Amino acid sequence: MTPACPLLLSVILSLRLATAFDPAPSACSALASGVLYGAFSLQDLFPTIASGCSWTLENPDPTKYSLYLRFNRQEQVCTHFAPRLLPLDHYLVNFTCLRPGPEEATARAESEVGRPEEEEEEAAAAASGLELCGGSGPFTFLHFDKNFVQLCLSAEPSEAPRLLAPAALAFRFVEVLLINNNNSSQFTCGVLCRWSEECGRAAGRACGFAQPGCSCPGEAGANPATTTSPGPPVAHTLSNALVPGGPAPPAEADLHSGSSNDLFTTEMRYGEEPEEEPKVKTQWPRSADEPGLYMAQTGDPAAEEWSPWSVCSLTCGQGLQVRTRSCVSSPYGTLCSGPLRETRPCNNSATCPVHGVWEEWGSWSLCSRSCGRGSRSRMRTCVPPQHGGKACEGPELQTKLCSMAACPVEGQWLEWGPWGPCSSSCANGTQQRSRKCSVAGPAWATCAGALTDTRECSNLDCPATDGKWGPWNAWSLCSKTCDTGWQRRFRMCQASGTQGYPCEGTGEEVKPCSEKRCPAFHEMCRDEYVMLMTWKRAAAGEIIYNKCPPNASGSASRRCLLSAQGVAYWGLPSFARCISHEYRYLYLSLREHLAKGQRMLAGEGMSQVVRSLQELLARRTYYSGDLLFSVDILRNVTDTFKRATYVPSADDVQRFFQVVSFMVDSENKDKWDDAQQVSPGSVHLLRVVEDFIHLVGDALKAFQSSLIVTDNLVISIQREPISAVSSDITFPMRGRRGMKDWVRHSEDRLFLPKEVLSLSSPGKPATPGAATAGSPGRGRGPGTVPPGPGHAHQRLLPADPEESSSYFVIGAVLYRTLGLILPPPRPPLAVTSRVMTVTVRPPTQPPAEPLITVELSYIINGTTDPHCASWDYSRADTNSGDWNTESCQTLETQAAHTRCQCQHLSTFAVLAQPPKDLTLELAGAPSVPLVIGCAVSCMALLTLLAIYAAFWRFIKSERSIILLNFCLSILASNILILVGQSRVLSKGVCTMTAAFLHFFFLSSFCWVLTEAWQSYLAVIGRMRTRLVRKRFLCLGWGLPALVVAVSVGFTRTKGYGTSSYCWLSLEGGLLYAFVGPAAVIVLVNMLIGIIVFNKLMARDGVSDKSKKQRAGSERCPWASLLLPCSACGAVPSPLLSSASARNAMASLWSSCVVLPLLALTWMSAVLAMTDRRSVLFQALFAVFNSAQGFVITAVHCFLRREVQDVVKCQMGVCRADESEDSPDSCKNGQLQILSDFEKDVDLACQTVLFKEVNTCNPSTITGTLSRLSLDEDEEPKSCLVGPEGGLSFSPLPGNILVPMAASPGLGEPPPPQETNPVYMCGEGGLRQLDLTWIRQSEPGSEGDYMVLPRRTLSLQPGGGGTAGEEAPRARPEGTPRRAAKTVAHTEGYPSFLSVEHSGLGLGPAYGSLQNPYGMTFQPPPPTPSARQVPEPGERSRTMPRTVPGSTMKLGSLERKKLRYSDLDFEKVMHTRKRHSELYHELNQKFHTFDRYRSQSSAKEKPSPPGGRPGLSQHRRHQSWSTFKSMTLGSLPPKPRERLALHRTAAWEPTEPPDGDFQTEV
């Protein structure tokens, strides 16, 4: 070896160590991984040289690699540090290597109590380690197959690093080599050979060892004494050169592999080189920097020669060929470059044979026997081999035993009786004997076997004179399998003598058989397909077995039952032997965790199992067999936690008890009843919970307690020292944070005095009475607890008596529903209270007198004769225990709870006789009162809906729409009430039914509130728009939907539907989600009703107008309006007609009657649904619900005036006071109803064209104006400004003023009077118009009608004059108001046209007209005016309906022809879509009168200012009819500003109206 090789190797190893070490947790311990070879010193391994420091080397795969170590002895290192090696399976961070002291050794011995002997020996060997300095030789060789090897400095004085020489610290005393056991490389074999060579040289004799795949050649010229086997000398072979070979010769000393640690200090010999065999080299040189990476080699390329390609790995199909090359460079020199192995694919044209393959096993067949032990089988098929492959190996049929339900006990035969006489007096005959069957009970079956026994008997031969009968043959099969059948047997007559006679008797015998009655057709259950399973036809009483559904494995059973009426029906299937695939997979995962050798890993695996089990049970979709399987999983988890050194975390404990809470939920009662037929799983669960409580309690500190709260159980665990129990124990603590409501409101209580816990006797077995719920075995020692049924292991309490008796672990559990699933007591008793469990370990000695006080509340009301009882595990008559009523005393019984006083700690409950009606099964259909009440209410409401649908076009209004929604909510509620009473609903359907029932109950209340709100808006005169109607819908349907959505979101549907009814649960406060909103709605409805009633009384109750104004609010500026403004939304007071008040009062009365009845109906419905046993609540609901339907129908249908009028007209009975041409008259029984638009047009035309005062009846005008409406299909058109500055006014008729005093003569000037302000509709709403700049206050005739043009007219000056007429000028700014008289009469006003009385030339008969107020009416003189009637040929105006005088008497047909003929009113349609177009056409007709006015205006054309002096007087007498429309652009700036409408600050405009202005509610 050259001097440069060790130097280069040391540099490479130092770099390797620098990167291979993992970051150490401290400077005193380090972990190295990925080291192939290295020689290390103290300075390399221990940066901080101190006692207890360690250096750990990792073996990447103990099954594939082995660690070889050589220790080079150095006296100073051995003296000061005493290094030793520890083989480890796991690496422990910051593990100290110091030898344990006496105290630590004792503690470690205590912690190892209970371990197997093998584990104790292994632990002792690991703790002591291997002393490296124990041998006498210079070298120590070690071989390890462990995961880790740790080098420790066990002893080191503080001054040792300063006393050691630097050479000793730098001395490489440890060499490490990692060898592949399957394929050793040349480098590793060379290192082993070098170690053997150096060992032989140092010892002075031959030294050798064997390694599979390596052999060391013999050195040339060696001493014959150093070799043990002859061989040819190898020339020019280096001592460290190694040729891979086969196994070493037997003469070599083997270095054994495995888990043993072998120490070699003796010399080793070289072996003989075997024959060279080709090997495939798969070892790449690994990098010295990163483990798992390969490093390129460098060296002489000429020394690298590839071997020939190997034979193809496969004889058929595509395989691989491999070739290798060897690196012959020195291990201490440069490394070779390039890979040592290459592969390439090789193709073979031969077809590979395909062996036969078994398919999946089929499903297991049914058990061969219906009871007892039978067998089940399954088969599989083999896919046939191909191309000469092998056939399938293994059985095709597989069988296993199966155990079904126990067979009925058969009776026992008594002894046989004596033989009877022989049947024949001569020759051969038969004898019979019989026996009796003893049946002990009615459930026993008959005896199996024959009742009689027959044998042949021999007599003397009969005389030959007569014939004789031969023997009887066997009885034939019965002719019927059921009912009475027949069996026959025959015998033959043997030949008689020549003088004899034939045989006497008959050769056939018949007897009845099969007296079992055949089931009738109605006593047979038919074939049924349920849950993906087919149940075949069976007779009543038979049990049919079937395979479980596809998502489970096992067998399901079902019994055919017989009802009280004698009709067969299928019972519920039993799935107690069905296990879901998910639960079975979880159990397999549990077995895998249990198979782990490491206890810590097994404990962590149990946490994962509990988490998975919680997720499965949270889905609530499992079979009864899954519950039993879950109990077994929890038992295994508890046992694993006990054996493992793993303390369950708080989350693990919470999940464990949450799983138990899911399992004992009341919804699983039927599943537990089904599972009890196979195994008492609820009792096993009770014991598992007690064991887990003590497991958690052992991990607690002294005086520490733990409280776990779930939906169905509350657990309290605390640990108290035996010597000083702090205080008495009271459970549960209702005031604790996070406690459930069912615990806070219950009266369950446990009082455990501390004297009971101070009576224990450590070291002595508890007396038979001291067995607690946690230690059910009575008469046993405290060290063991017998396992329950199915338990595979026994629990060993701590063996140390001081530790086991120094602390009490006290556990108390309050179960909410455990009494429903535990095995029931003997009838007629039943568990009628909650169940409470108290367990204490170590067990206490029972006191001399009862000191434990337990108070338990009832879960079933109406029970009698209560008894306190405890669960006794030692009852001999049952294998799991039973209730014992003798262990507790019943102190007092109250209406809500019972107080008990017991002597032993156990599981307590109250047993009593349930009420008789509780034993009756609830019917699957709703009760008769509920059906009657819902049916009557639905029929009444459907009648109302049918009537409204028939007359909808005549009675359509907001009130009707609200009523229809209200009826729909009540109908849906009645239907859901009937659906929710069915017991066949699933959990999801029941939850949805409860949620929708909650929604429709609230919506019915909300629609009553909506009706009250609509009444209030009608009374105050606010116009309803589409926005308001949308608010009605939001209140009626949106508010209930919001309440239900919030409730469902917060509760996650918990509480919506229970196992008894489909309604809100009475526990948990969810019922307030219905009671609270309903109460608020009733209160708000009452307040609105009071307000509406006060407003109606304040308006209709005061007769004097002045008092009414003083009593009311301040008069609004738009109160004088007789028409609504389409822009501001103001409604004038005349529109609030008496019909509005009447409708509002009717709506108010309806709310006052319907709302209380609605509240009583739903309250009785809730009581009837939640308590189905009470017939009183069901009867009350039927009465209230029926009355509610009749009242709603009567109020809104039979008593409603609109419906009555429509029905009368349909029947041909209308008002008799109307004329034949009345728009609402009926002819020949046919209804002639004019649209609202036609009525308005008719009234406007009569008022404008014929200025008859008597036709302008105020009541008629008010009634007509109250019917004004807009088209519902069109958006409202607000008042907009025209393109030229003009105003667009409402197309509806204008201001109609009723004369309040005597009308002056037509030729007399009207007396001066104060005119009402005029309002205009603009963009901003309603504004008052200033008219003082146009003229003085000159009122027109009170009968004048103001027409508002629909659209902007061409308001150009000088409309009626000649072409040369001057344009009018507006009044300049600052001109006084009286100067307005000088304004030319051709100046138009942009909004109104004044209409004078039309002169018709009626004659004297028209002169004595009286107005409605009794004043004499003088007709005006016939002067030429713009409103005069033209020539007879041009006369085509509409005549009034009733005109006094003979000259106006025309036939109805002529009047109809004359009516509106020139106005072309045939275009008037009943639809409202053409209202706008017809109004525009009507206004154009009105403005055609301007051409007649132009002639009179030309005659009286005014002169310019300064002209005739009588001009002002003439203009003073002009009326408003002389003004025409003009644009705002023609006005001066100042007058234009004065024309701007003023907005009153006392009121705010509303939104544009959309819909009718009807004030009907």
From Swiss-Prot:
<feature type="disulfide bond">
    <location>
        <begin position="525"/>
        <end position="560"/>
    </location>
</feature>
<feature type="signal peptide">
    <location>
        <begin position="1"/>
        <end position="20"/>
    </location>
</feature>
<dbReference type="InterPro" id="IPR000203">
    <property type="entry name" value="GPS"/>
</dbReference>
<feature type="disulfide bond">
    <location>
        <begin position="888"/>
        <end position="902"/>
    </location>
</feature>
<keyword id="KW-1015">Disulfide bond</keyword>
<feature type="disulfide bond">
    <location>
        <begin position="426"/>
        <end position="462"/>
    </location>
</feature>
<keyword id="KW-1003">Cell membrane</keyword>
<dbReference type="InterPro" id="IPR051867">
    <property type="entry name" value="Angio_Inhib/Adhesion_GPCR"/>
</dbReference>
<keyword id="KW-0964">Secreted</keyword>
<feature type="modified residue" description="Phosphotyrosine">
    <location>
        <position position="1345"/>
    </location>
</feature>
<dbReference type="InterPro" id="IPR000832">
    <property type="entry name" value="GPCR_2_secretin-like"/>
</dbReference>
<dbReference type="InterPro" id="IPR032471">
    <property type="entry name" value="GAIN_dom_N"/>
</dbReference>
<feature type="compositionally biased region" description="Basic and acidic residues">
    <location>
        <begin position="1366"/>
        <end position="1376"/>
    </location>
</feature>
<dbReference type="GO" id="GO:0004930">
    <property type="term" value="F:G protein-coupled receptor activity"/>
</dbReference>
<feature type="disulfide bond">
    <location>
        <begin position="327"/>
        <end position="336"/>
    </location>
</feature>
<dbReference type="GO" id="GO:0007166">
    <property type="term" value="P:cell surface receptor signaling pathway"/>
</dbReference>
<feature type="disulfide bond">
    <location>
        <begin position="482"/>
        <end position="518"/>
    </location>
</feature>
<dbReference type="InterPro" id="IPR057244">
    <property type="entry name" value="GAIN_B"/>
</dbReference>
<feature type="topological domain" description="Cytoplasmic">
    <location>
        <begin position="1169"/>
        <end position="1561"/>
    </location>
</feature>
<keyword id="KW-0732">Signal</keyword>
<feature type="disulfide bond">
    <location>
        <begin position="312"/>
        <end position="346"/>
    </location>
</feature>
<comment type="function">
    <text>Orphan G-protein coupled receptor involved in cell adhesion and probably in cell-cell interactions. Activates NFAT-signaling pathway, a transcription factor, via the G-protein GNAZ. Involved in angiogenesis inhibition.</text>
</comment>
<feature type="disulfide bond">
    <location>
        <begin position="868"/>
        <end position="900"/>
    </location>
</feature>
<feature type="domain" description="TSP type-1 1">
    <location>
        <begin position="300"/>
        <end position="353"/>
    </location>
</feature>
<feature type="disulfide bond">
    <location>
        <begin position="548"/>
        <end position="578"/>
    </location>
</feature>
<dbReference type="Pfam" id="PF16489">
    <property type="entry name" value="GAIN"/>
</dbReference>
<feature type="topological domain" description="Extracellular">
    <location>
        <begin position="1052"/>
        <end position="1072"/>
    </location>
</feature>
<feature type="domain" description="GAIN-B">
    <location>
        <begin position="748"/>
        <end position="918"/>
    </location>
</feature>
<feature type="transmembrane region" description="Helical; Name=3">
    <location>
        <begin position="989"/>
        <end position="1009"/>
    </location>
</feature>
<feature type="transmembrane region" description="Helical; Name=5">
    <location>
        <begin position="1073"/>
        <end position="1093"/>
    </location>
</feature>
<feature type="domain" description="TSP type-1 4">
    <location>
        <begin position="466"/>
        <end position="519"/>
    </location>
</feature>
<dbReference type="GO" id="GO:0007186">
    <property type="term" value="P:G protein-coupled receptor signaling pathway"/>
</dbReference>
<feature type="disulfide bond">
    <location>
        <begin position="422"/>
        <end position="457"/>
    </location>
</feature>
<dbReference type="GO" id="GO:0045202">
    <property type="term" value="C:synapse"/>
</dbReference>
<feature type="topological domain" description="Cytoplasmic">
    <location>
        <begin position="1094"/>
        <end position="1115"/>
    </location>
</feature>
<feature type="disulfide bond">
    <location>
        <begin position="478"/>
        <end position="513"/>
    </location>
</feature>
<dbReference type="InterPro" id="IPR036445">
    <property type="entry name" value="GPCR_2_extracell_dom_sf"/>
</dbReference>
<dbReference type="GO" id="GO:0033173">
    <property type="term" value="P:calcineurin-NFAT signaling cascade"/>
</dbReference>
<dbReference type="InterPro" id="IPR017981">
    <property type="entry name" value="GPCR_2-like_7TM"/>
</dbReference>
<feature type="glycosylation site" description="N-linked (GlcNAc...) asparagine">
    <location>
        <position position="94"/>
    </location>
</feature>
<dbReference type="GO" id="GO:0005886">
    <property type="term" value="C:plasma membrane"/>
</dbReference>
<dbReference type="Pfam" id="PF00002">
    <property type="entry name" value="7tm_2"/>
</dbReference>
